[in-house]
């Protein structure tokens, strides 16, 4: 209980330091990580090691992806391609249905693509849509964020659900089937949250981007900007490559284990796939490409814009790693495991661990390990029950995304949100969506178990 209270105080410090005191989130998170570790009784050397490993590991896994995504987004915006693409999406969906379109796109993209990578890839499209429709950036950003999260935590082939299915000996096909159903229900709740709550928070889509990119719209009127199909290729090609890699890694090994599999496994890695997207984005420039590639050109501006996002995301990873090392996840999981809550138990354990240490994947895997020996006792050891337990764990792994979650910082920093707004929208949104998903799992279990 002491660790839980300490965590609550630490989160309050982060929020107050960044909103009231105006401290940069990077410093606030590092201070919080070190302070929590020391007050939790961790050896000082272990605290520093956890900070370094968490910071470096997070940047190592997503730093290049954020940089590449920033470059793609900058070229899309300044070439006029994002505007053309936004016009096309608006023509299909209509201005009133932009949040629904972003949510569905996120739900589909996150089936094979990590939610943070998907948000990086699609955030420039969301910004362009908000600018074109003249609406707040917050609505589409939260709809996209929650849409990505729905499938990321509940539907294979993302690593968390796959690992949980393996630990619990659940049939992967059943997990996919129930996961798709429950995540679709969660998607609907996320969309409703976006249009009823996030829409009340105005975030100017022209803010938070380099000044030079704000003149993008002018390029669209002179006929020099790329068409919508050309503009979407830097987004679709990386996604397609990542999808192929995920398919190739399925247990059935559809591409075999030879040279073709090796090629797909290489080009489908998120880093390589996004770099391919960067190369395609360069083709969006109609004239004077060379001047765009230097330190003072579009590439340089994109790297500068991404730098702040990367260090904040890395410090969020450092905070999460310290929490993992403190043992708070074990404390929460062990206490909840003694309760008798049926299908709600895996959700609550996963939610507690997720809230405590930030990583959805760690939450899913840890909870699956805790639940495995309890399934027979809880009468949840049938094939269908095991699959639903995996989905329930995934629902819990959404609750909640806050300051110790690197995805929280990706969403807030790419969407122009301060910490308080992020808590109001991203954190509360994941609470609503995860709870709705868990309720859906429970209701389904009443009829099929």
Task: Give names to the regions the model predicted.
Residues 177-297, 449:
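Long, contiguous bundles of hydrophobic transmembrane helices that form the permeation core
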Residues 63-69, 92-125, 310-316, 339-378, ...:
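Hydrophobic alpha-helical transmembrane segments of multi-pass integral membrane proteins
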Residues 173-217, 395-449:
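Juxtamembrane and boundary regions of transmembrane helices in multi-pass small-molecule transporters
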Residues 42, 77-82, 92-96, 128-140, ...:
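Juxtamembrane helix-boundary/capping and inter-helix hinge elements in multi-pass membrane proteins
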Residues 2-71, 84, 88-92, 241-315, ...:
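Hydrophobic transmembrane alpha-helices of multi-pass solute/ion transporters
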Residues 95-111, 133-153, 171-180, 184, ...:
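Alpha-helical transmembrane segments of multi-pass membrane proteins
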Residues 6-18, 30-38, 66-71, 105-109, ...:
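Hydrophobic core segments of alpha-helical transmembrane domains in multi-pass membrane transport
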Residues 1-5, 56-62, 89-104, 132-140, ...:
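Membrane-interfacial loop-to-helix junctions in multi-pass transporters
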């Amino acid at each position: 209980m002491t660790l839980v209270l300490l965590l609550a105080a630490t989160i309050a410090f982060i929020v107050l330091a960044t909103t009231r005191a105006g401290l940069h989130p990077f410093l606030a998170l590092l201070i919080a990580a070190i302070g929590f570790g020391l007050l939790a009784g961790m050896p000082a050397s272990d605290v520093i090691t956890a900070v370094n490993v968490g910071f470096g590991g997070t940047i190592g896994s997503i730093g290049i992806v954020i940089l590449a995504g920033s470059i793609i987004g900058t070229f899309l915006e300044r070439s006029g391609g994002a505007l053309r693409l936004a016009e096309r999406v608006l023509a299909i969906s209509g201005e009133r249905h932009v949040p629904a379109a972003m949510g569905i796109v996120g739900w589909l993209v996150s089936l094979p693509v990590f939610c943070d990578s998907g948000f990086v890839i699609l955030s420039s499209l969301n910004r362009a849509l908000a600018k074109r429709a003249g609406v707040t950036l917050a609505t589409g950003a939260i709809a996209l964020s929650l849409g990505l999260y729905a499938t990321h935590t509940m539907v294979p082939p993302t690593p968390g659900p796959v690992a949980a299915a393996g630990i619990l000996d659940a049939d992967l096909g059943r997990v996919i089937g129930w996961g798709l159903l429950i995540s679709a229900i969660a998607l609907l709740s996320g969309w409703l949250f976006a249009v009823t709550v996030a829409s009340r928070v105005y975030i100017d889509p022209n803010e938070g981007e380099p000044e030079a990119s704000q003149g993008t719209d002018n390029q669209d009127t002179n006929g020099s900007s790329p068409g919508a199909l050309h503009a979407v290729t830097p987004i679709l090609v990386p996604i397609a490559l990542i999808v192929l890699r995920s398919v190739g890694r399925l247990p059935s090994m559809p591409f075999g284990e030879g040279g073709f599999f090796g090629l797909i496994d290489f080009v489908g890695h998120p880093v390589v796939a996004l770099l391919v997207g960067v190369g395609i984005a360069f083709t969006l420039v109609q004239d004077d490409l060379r001047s765009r590639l230097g330190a003072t050109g579009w590439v340089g501006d994109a790297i500068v814009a991404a730098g702040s996002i990367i260090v904040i995301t890395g410090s969020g990873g450092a905070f999460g790693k310290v929490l993992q090392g403190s043992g708070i996840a074990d404390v929460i999981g062990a206490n909840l495991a003694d309760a008798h809550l049926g299908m709600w138990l895996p959700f609550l354990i996963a939610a507690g661990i997720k809230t405590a240490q930030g990583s959805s994947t760690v939450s899913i895997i840890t909870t699956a390990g805790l639940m495995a020996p309890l399934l027979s006792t809880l009468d949840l050891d049938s094939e269908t029950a095991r699959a639903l337990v995996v989905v329930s764990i995934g629902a819990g792994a959404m609750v909640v995304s806050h300051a110790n979650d690197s995805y929280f910082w990706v969403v807030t920093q790419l969407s122009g949100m301060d910490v308080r707004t992020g808590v109001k929208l991203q954190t509360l949104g994941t609470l609503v969506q995860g709870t709705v998903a868990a309720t859906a799992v429970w209701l389904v279990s009443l009829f099929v178990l």
